[in-house]
């Protein structure tokens, strides 16, 4: 997830806003726009323009130009570099049911620099099978396998009541960041980055 030294000096709130900025900027780039103002970004994200400028100052050395704003291509490049999206990072997926299967086949993860290398489930019917090229392992081996693979990112797609236990096992295996699609609040050490996904938005996947 980018340069560790760089990220440790940035608040989790700022890091958490970067993927949304990136999605919006890519939409604008796709529409043919070349520049954008912090005010436009703020309005789309329902934030204060001052906050947006502070966030962008963290990851970009390029200042916005009066009346022109920021160059979209440069901001996209800087955010990709900051988050490590310009490098592929391996991740594991826990939960191979309906949502998990959809996530395993979601090509958009590559836009975030993520490559799912293994999936886990407790259902005997699913263990040993593959979903979209990703092999499903027994969930009881989660911690051991994550440690063996040296994976730092975990994606949780299990029912809410099981999410905390899964998160604890991921952390025990060495995971440093969790993308949580389960409808549950996770209590984790302060040095573990957590992104709680809005399920309404997730259904769009």
Model-derived regions: residue spans:
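Glycine-rich Rossmann-fold phosphate-binding loop(s) that bind the pyrophosphate
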Residues: 96-97
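HTH-adjacent hinge/linker in prokaryotic transcriptional regulators
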Residues: 35, 39, 43-88
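NAD(P)-binding Rossmann-fold cofactor-contacting core
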Residues: 110-132
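Phosphate-bearing ligand-interacting subdomains
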Residues: 26-29, 134-205
């Amino acid at each position: 997830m980018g340069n560790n030294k760089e990220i440790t000096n940035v608040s989790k709130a700022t890091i958490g806003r970067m993927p949304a900025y990136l999605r919006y900027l890519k939409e604008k780039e796709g529409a043919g726009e070349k520049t954008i103002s912090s005010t436009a970004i703020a309005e789309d994200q329902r934030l204060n323009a001052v906050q947006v400028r502070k966030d962008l100052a963290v990851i970009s050395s390029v200042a916005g130009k009066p009346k022109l704003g920021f160059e979209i291509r440069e901001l996209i490049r800087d955010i990709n570099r900051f988050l490590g999206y310009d490098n592929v990072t391996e991740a594991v997926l826990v939960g191979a049911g309906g949502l998990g299967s959809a996530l395993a086949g979601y090509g958009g993860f590559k836009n975030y620099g993520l490559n799912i290398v293994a999936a886990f489930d407790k259902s005997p019917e699913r263990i040993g099978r593959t979903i979209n090229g990703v092999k499903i392992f027994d969930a009881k081996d989660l911690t051991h396998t994550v440690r063996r693979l040296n994976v730092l990112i975990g994606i949780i797609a299990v029912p809410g009541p099981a999410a905390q236990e899964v998160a604890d096992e991921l952390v025990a295996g060495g995971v440093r960041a969790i993308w949580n699609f389960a409808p549950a609040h996770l209590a984790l050490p302060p040095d573990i980055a957590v992104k709680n996904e809005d399920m309404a938005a997730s259904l769009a996947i």
